[in-house]
UniProtKB/Swiss-Prot annotation:
Coiled-coil regions listed in the entry: none
Organism: Rhodobacter capsulatus (Rhodopseudomonas capsulata)
Known catalytic reactions: GTP + AH2 + S-adenosyl-L-methionine = (8S)-3',8-cyclo-7,8-dihydroguanosine 5'-triphosphate + 5'-deoxyadenosine + L-methionine + A + H(+)
Phylogenetic classification of the source organism: Bacteria, Pseudomonadati, Pseudomonadota, Alphaproteobacteria, Rhodobacterales
Chain positions recorded as S-adenosyl-L-methionine binding sites: 31, 64, 118, 188
Record-linked Gene3D superfamilies: Aldolase class I
Record pathway: Cofactor biosynthesis; molybdopterin biosynthesis
The protein's name in its UniProt record: GTP 3',8-cyclase
Highest taxon, organism lineage: Bacteria
Keyword Cytoplasm: no
Residues engaged in binding [4Fe-4S] cluster 2: 252, 255, 269
Subunit structure: Monomer and homodimer.
Residues binding [4Fe-4S] cluster 1: 25, 29, 32
């Protein structure tokens, strides 16, 4: 099993593993990957059986878009067996929602209780432009199917100045009307960055909150879900809104998560290039304490924090790898 507890060199307990099952996606969101992205050869991607061998207690499945991975239903069924046997405590999914309608019922039957769905706009034309060819009605259908199957849905919206800053109220209203939690996320300097784009689009979440407060009364609720979000309750609706602010409110000192790419690289920080390659040991069938030693050694090297930053005229700490590679 994954060793528990895990502690890095700065005394932070690491309790949360995000596992990317694929770098492939049926969309090309401009802040996530290049339009002409080259995907990994399939023989470099960990098999689902190799991922199963990790033996984690809490697992968030990400991508790319995890639901485009061939055989993903079988993987979730295996994870469901672990849940029922008490070998896994929690199984969740982050998705763009386009394939969710076809999978929602089976995900619920496997023991998934909640899903995070990326939704940066409610406008079909803008959605197609942001994703480069996506159809927003597929996402709406996926959310409806997930809720019909009994899954709790949280919406993740990237705050993009000049792109969706005119929809903050609309997104909040839509989330409330459809009984979804909503989390706003600051734009990070990752992947392909056309000249000036990230500087122009970066919108500090303090400004987003201030904008929301011109219409809503937001109450800090002190909720701690073990992640980086700061939560408020909207007094008028009772809904929950989260703010993930890796730049304006750096949360590195309490970071408790690591990411495993579909290639087997363990990244202990989104904003640093250092990683540990677990693919050789997973492919060799290493399990138990031997695997735990490899993971402990990797987590001991977790850096103090990221180097992201936006200046008046420059972007600092850019990570060349895209989010589809690292795992969203």
């Amino acid at each position: 099993m994954l060793p528990d507890p895990l502690c890095d060199g700065f005394g932070r307990d690491v309790r949360y593993l995000r596992v990317s099952v694929t770098d492939r996606c049926d969309l090309r969101c401009s802040y996530c990957m290049k339009e002409d992205v080259t995907f990994l050869p399939r023989n470099q991607v960990l098999s689902l059986e190799e991922l199963d061998r990790l033996g984690v207690r809490k697992l968030r499945v990400t991508g790319g878009e995890p639901l485009v991975r061939r055989g993903i239903g079988t993987f979730f069924a295996a994870m469901g067996t672990h849940l029922r046997a008490g070998r896994l405590d929690e199984l969740t999914l982050t998705t763009n929602g386009t394939q969710l309608a076809a999978h929602a019922q089976s995900l619920a039957e496997c023991g998934v209780k909640r899903v995070n769905v990326s939704l940066d706009t409610l406008q079909a034309e803008k959605y197609a432009r942001l994703t480069r060819f996506g159809r927003i009605e597929q996402v709406f259908a996926g959310i409806a199917a997930a809720q019909a199957a009994g899954l709790r849905v949280k919406l993740n919206a990237m705050a993009l100045k000049g792109v969706n800053d005119d929809e903050i109220f609309a997104l909040t209203d839509w989330a409330a009307a459809h009984h979804c939690d909503l989390t706003f996320i600051e734009l990070m300097p990752m992947g392909d960055i056309p000249a000036g784009t990230r500087l122009d689009q970066f919108w500090p979440l303090d400004d987003v909150r201030a904008h929301l407060e011109t219409r809503f009364r937001l109450i800090d609720n002190g909720l701690n879900t073990g992640g980086p979000a700061r939560y408020v309750t909207v007094a008028q609706t009772g809904q929950r809104i989260g703010f993930i602010s890796p730049l304006s409110h750096n949360f590195c000192t309490s970071c408790n998560r690591v990411r495993l790419t579909c290639k087997g690289e363990l990244y202990t920080c989104l904003g640093q290039e250092g990683s540990s390659d677990l693919r050789p040991v997973l492919r060799a069938g290493v399990e138990g304490e031997a695997l735990a030693r490899e993971i402990r050694a990797a987590i001991a090297r977790k850096p103090a924090g990221h180097a992201f930053g936006y200046g008046p005229c420059s972007v600092a700490g850019q990570m060349v790898r895209g989010m589809n590679h690292t795992g969203g």
